[in-house]
Design a protein with these regions (language model features):
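Asp-box/BNR beta-propeller blade signature and adjacent active/binding-site loops
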Residues: 1-184
Length: 184
């Protein structure tokens, strides 16, 4: 059987992404599509400590854009936890543009389960929109790979890269890249 959770702590959100941390808590990251919310062009996050029944520690994630920045409507983004033992490395994808077109699909990296996002890397500067992420499985040929599927103009594309490539991106000023991350 299954049960629904309590609602997310803010109205006007949707198309959420979830990732379980190594301690069993669940990180919730969501789109905002209501211009009555504060900072409607930024992503929202919360955490569950009870298997997703309730959500706490709600916050606006200042460093993560939510779609086009000239209007409040958001854009579905992707989220994945990399399967690295004992580490809460998350990747998040969305568009990162000040323009009026959906473009510049970008991936951000967190090394502390979504608390900070210290690095981002542009994947493609052209048209892009909704995106999803997945990670290769340990002990398979896909181990260490990160997969980004995204809308690109009238079709879709798949990009494949690894954490080392992402670390070559731009520092956001939101937290630090830990020394151990460069040795993975």
């Amino acid at each position: 059987t299954w049960q629904t959770s309590d609602p997310f702590p803010e109205r006007g959100t949707g198309e959420a992404t979830l990732a379980e941390r190594t301690d069993g808590t669940i990180y919730y990251n969501t789109r905002c599509h209501w211009d009555q919310n504060p900072q409607p062009t930024r992503r929202r996050a919360a955490v569950s400590e009870d298997d997703g029944a309730t959500w706490k520690d709600f916050k606006v994630v200042d460093v993560l854009p939510d779609g086009l920045q000239h209007r409040a409507y958001g854009c579905m983004g992707g989220l994945v936890r990399l399967p690295i033992q004992g580490r809460d490395i998350f990747c998040f994808s969305n568009i990162d543009t000040a323009g009026e077109q959906r473009e510049r699909v970008t991936v951000w990296v967190s090394f502390d389960g979504g608390e900070t996002w210290p690095v981002k890397r542009l994947v493609e500067s052209g048209p892009s929109a909704y995106s999803s992420l997945n990670a290769g499985r340990p002990k398979t040929p896909s181990e260490g790979q990160i997969y980004l599927h995204y809308e690109a103009g009238s079709g879709s594309k798949l990009a494949r890269f690894n954490l080392a490539w992402l670390l070559g991106g731009e520092r956001t000023g939101d937290g630090k890249v830990p020394a151990w991350a460069t040795q993975l």
